[in-house]
Structure formats: structure tokens, C-alpha cells
Amino acid sequence: MLLRFYFNGLLFVGCLLSWGRSDTEEQCHTFTDLNIHNSIIGTGLKVQLLLYTRENPKCAQDLNVDNSTGFQYLNVTRRTVFITHGYRPTGSPPVWIDDIVKKFLDIQDFNVIVVDWNRGATTVLYHNAAANTRKVADILKRFIDNMLSQGATLDSIYMVGVSLGAHISGFVGKMYNGSIGRITGLDPAGPLFNGKPPEERLHYTDAQFVDVVHSDTDGLGYKESLGHIDFYPNGGTDQPGCPKTILAGSEYFKCDHQRSVFLYIASLTKSCDLVAFPCKSYRDYRIGNCTDCKEFLPLSCPVLGFYADKWKDHLVKRNHPGTTAFFDTAAKDPYCIFHYYLDFMTWSSQIRRGYITIKLTSLDGNVTESKLDKDAAVFEQYKEESLLAKFDQDMDPISRISVTFTTGSVIGPKYKLRVLRMRLRPFTNRNRPILCRYDFVLLENIETEFIPIPCEDTNL
């Protein structure tokens, strides 16, 4: 009898605690977490829409696909960002999900909706996941239709798609005849989509503005241009800091592909701009042929990421293929490279071919170095040679400049390069002063250091 009394008492207390939790605590939904076992046996498609706002930045609300009413935090008058992931061969949640949600909410009180289709993307058979992309798009179309019926507008819809998610975003856009506000494709998937007609992949007509980042065109990503503007960091292939051999395991396969996401996330913080240069090829960019962005005045050259839509009015007027833009990055967050033009006017009587290495030193003693190009520069008497220099640190102000000239030859005589004028022009931060040095000699393989001075005539 006593045992029964204690049991009933515990049961009563348990009910009180349960009742108290139901009133004071809300249920937080999380991204589906699967494993390699699920990948092997396969998963049926199930889509979960996880809503985050500034009112619930860490506790996602699970939205009903067929009903956009009755949700505590969904405000259809806000701009809504749909974030859609891609193929998940191991079933684990994307490592970048929490970070991208937080960064969006730091900028503005969006409706941030994570499109969790991990059940459907988790499989060892990539073609099965690819086949589900249309089905996911159909589900998103139903939900957006409900939002529109509650007062949302297509202008306020922004879709960010990663890999297969980029094509899902495109399929949604097609169902609205390209009227949704914006699509950003982050390294759209290449396998099974390369060479397909526009109706079977992401296309620039799928939204009012489509911007695309290509970071693994020789692997898992799509190579050709797809948007109004296509960004190719580091030429769109081997990303700095990523493994170069298969000995690194899975990182070798996914690092380049994922870099597009991390570059985009870096753009949300705006700690520095990832400035890109419209150009026909990566080689043309590397040799400094593509730094004229007068066509975008009063704006500067386009920047990758969230703020790329500032260039929308210029870009959407162009015929397809649209604008391809190239730039280099550093190996680590925030990935920014700071560009300078280095102009040499030489007075050596003989033509010299060689390589230039330049170091910049700040007032506090920090040093950053740039080897200007993989190809030898040609220095002719009284003919200006302009080289594009790239640094992974921002030096302001610059207290000293060091320059080394080399021909790359290990045998034979050592040459001199007689410099009439060297000019350092900031390109990333164009409001900074142009610096010069006049009448000096570079001895091959000898580092020459000097204090720069303001140029006598910046029009030279």
C-alpha cells in the first residue's frame, strides 16, 4: 500500500512537471541527423522547413508545407531567405548551417528557412538524390503559394542553393516564370547537370537576379556560366588551403566544393569585400588585363556574396552569357585579397625578362608579400609594364616597400634592372594615396628596400 502511495505521488509530480514544461518551453526542431547506414540503405524523401527569425534565432520552428498560417514567428511581410543544401552522402548535417543562419539574422530580421531534405539527399547513389531535386522544388512551390496567399510577394523571396540545392532553387524559379526576387547558386552541382538545357538546371532566367559562385569546376561543380554574373574564385578550381592529394580523405573531395559556401558566409560579415574583376578568363585576370570597371560607375568592381545585388541594374541588361568575374582569395576566413597595380618604367637599354616579388611593411611592423605572376614580365626601355599584385593583409599606411627582381636562371650572369619610376596604385581601396619611387637599380636576387613617397604626378 505504501509503495502504491509513493508511486501515485511520483506520477502526480511527473504530470505537474510535464504540464509546466508544456506551457513554458517551446519545442525546438533540428536538422535531420542521419549516418552512413542510412546512406547505404537509402532514405525516402521527406522535407522539413526550419524557420529562424530574430525572435527565435536558435530554436527552429517546423513549418507545415501546406499551411503558412498559424505560425508564431513567420511574418510574410519580411524578406524570406530559403537555404537549400545539396547531396549528403554521409547523412550528417552541413557544418555551415548554424553559421549562415546566424549571419543572416545579424544583418536583418529575415525569415530564414532552412530546407532540410536530408531524407532524400542521403544516399550512396548520387543519381537518386539528383532525381529528388524536382520533387523538393514542387514542395517548396506549394509552401510559397501559401505564403503568397497570406500577403507575401515574389520580390521578397531569396533562394540560396548549395550544389544540388542551386538547381532546386532554379526549378522553383521556373515555376514562377523567373519572378522571384533572387537566386544565389553556390557551386551548383555539375554531375548529371553539365550540358543540360536551361529547363533542366539553374538558369539566369529563373529569377530577377541570379548570381553564381563556382569553386570546384573540375570536380563536383558546374563549369559554364549560369547567372547574370558568375564568380570564379581562384579560377574556379583549386582553392587555397584545400588538400591537393587524396591522402587527405573526404576533405580532398569536398573542400573545393564547400569553399563557395564559406566565401558567401564571409561576405555576410562584410569585414572586407571579396572584389571580383569582370574578365574573359582567369589568365587575363592574373596578368592584370581586367581591372577596368568603368562600366559599373559610380559603383566599383562587383563583390561576391550577399551584396552582389547592388550591381543588379547593370548586370541584368546584358545579353547572355552574362558577366564572368575572377579573383583570388586567401586560404582562411575572411579570405580577402588586397589588390595593387605595380607599374614599372625602366630605362635599361636591353630588354629584361623576369619576376618581381614585393613586400609591404606597415607602421607597426607587419609584413605581407606578393610574387606578382607565374609568367615572366617583359621590361623594355621607356615602356611601362603593369603588374597585378595581391596581398592577404591590408597594410595602411605603408611605411616601407621591398622589391626583388629575378630572371629565374640559376646559371649565367646576374642582371640589373634600371628603374626610372615604380608606382604602387591601390585597387581594392582606391581612395588611398598612390605611392612612388624614382631612379633606382634592382640587382638580381637582391632585395631592395626603400621608403615610398607620394607620386609627383599620378597621371604619369
Curated annotation (Swiss-Prot):
Its EC number is 3.1.1.-. The keyword Disulfide bond applies. One of its GO terms (cellular component) is extracellular region. Its main location: secreted. The active site is at residues 163, 187, 257. Disulfide bonds join 242-255, 279-290, 293-301, 436-455. GO terms for molecular function: carboxylic ester hydrolase activity; lipase activity. Glycans are attached at residues 67, 75, 177, 289, 366. InterPro entries: AB_hydrolase_fold (IPR029058), Lipase (IPR013818), Lipase_LIPH (IPR016272), Lipase_N (IPR033906), TAG_lipase (IPR000734). Keywords: Cell membrane, Disulfide bond, Glycoprotein, Hydrolase, Lipid degradation, Lipid metabolism, Membrane, Secreted, Signal. The keyword Lipid metabolism applies. It is a peripheral membrane protein. CDD domains: Pancreat_lipase_like. It catalyses: 1-hexadecanoyl-2-(9Z-octadecenoyl)-sn-glycero-3-phosphate + H2O = 2-(9Z-octadecenoyl)-sn-glycero-3-phosphate + hexadecanoate + H(+). Residues 1-24 form the signal peptide. It is found in: Secreted; Cell membrane. GO terms for biological process: lipid catabolic process. Belongs to the AB hydrolase superfamily. Lipase family. Hydrolyzes specifically phosphatidic acid (PA) to produce 2-acyl lysophosphatidic acid (LPA; a potent bioactive lipid mediator) and fatty acid. Does not hydrolyze other phospholipids, like phosphatidylserine (PS), phosphatidylcholine (PC) and phosphatidylethanolamine (PE) or triacylglycerol (TG). This is Lipase member H. It comes from Xenopus tropicalis. The gene is liph.
